Amino acid sequence: MTIKNVIFSLFILAILAETVFSQNCMDTSCPGLKECCSRWGFCGTKDEYCGFFCFSGPCNIKGKSYGYDYNVDAGPRGKIETVITSALFDSIMSKVESNCSAKGFYTYEAFITAFKSFGAYKGKVAKREIAAILAHFSYGSKSFCYKEEISNERYCSKSKKYPCEPGKNYYGRGLLQSITWNEYYGAGKHLGLPLLKDPDLVSRSPEVAFKFAMWFWNRNVRPALYLGFGEITKRVDGRECGNWRRDDTKNKVKQYIEFCEMLGVTPDQGLDC
């Protein structure tokens, strides 16, 4: 092989490596400090990367909504304990049926403690976001009726980083029961909790249940708030989008609108996914 061919081959490999990197930027981030990762997983510095559809990086989304009010992080704000008071929380939980296994499990104290354990919620929070969180938590637990998935599958993958504990199952527990598999229970590493060794801790402790769900929300959902309720629904459980589970999507949107009305705010316009 000539030197010219070697140089050409290295050039092609560099391009391929850059392409592969950019296509996975939602997992690996972009190589350049000035680059943005788009919601489709590509890196760049132009408006299609850093504008309205920016996922991470130095996003510039102000004025990029193209006339639509999509931002779930917009509108009236307040501290979590003033937006959701003890009386309002009790009113929501009073609708839980007496035959529900989680009746009385989800408490106001656990709710507030879990929220305030994340820096983003120690100050004022958009009421829309709180409404969206409640809608997803309510839907994910069947209106706060359950604290664990009815179908108790094992959901164990061969992960060296988050190995399964012998005899333990990693099915959905808590408020977002679409969160399954041992990798997600690896959240215990970030929460300071032994969730891989003791996944049932999520269904034993209301505070842990809220923290587990809030960890997922902060990590996977919150970066997309400006894209609308439909987009964050896709990030919680993409199976609900499209034509496969339209009734599920409609019911979740209905709950979001109801919680928005309860908090005195208008929902965003990006409801569908």
Curated annotation (Swiss-Prot):
Segments of this protein annotated with the region Catalytic: 78-273
Disulfide bonds: C25-C37, C30-C43, C36-C50, C54-C59
Protein family according to the UniProt entry: Belongs to the glycosyl hydrolase 19 family. Chitinase class I subfamily.
Record protein name field: Inactive endochitinase At2g43600
Glycosylation sites: N99
Signal peptide interval: 1-22
GO MF annotations, alphabetized: chitin binding; chitinase activity
Keywords (A to Z) from UniProt: Chitin-binding, Disulfide bond, Glycoprotein, Plant defense, Signal
InterPro entries assigned: Chitin-bd_1, Chitin-binding_1_CS, Endochitinase-like_sf, Glyco_hydro_19, Glyco_hydro_19_cat, Lysozyme-like_dom_sf
PANTHER family, alphabetized: CHITINASE-RELATED, GLYCOSIDE HYDROLASE FAMILY 19 CATALYTIC DOMAIN-CONTAINING PROTEIN
Domain Chitin-binding type-1: 23-61
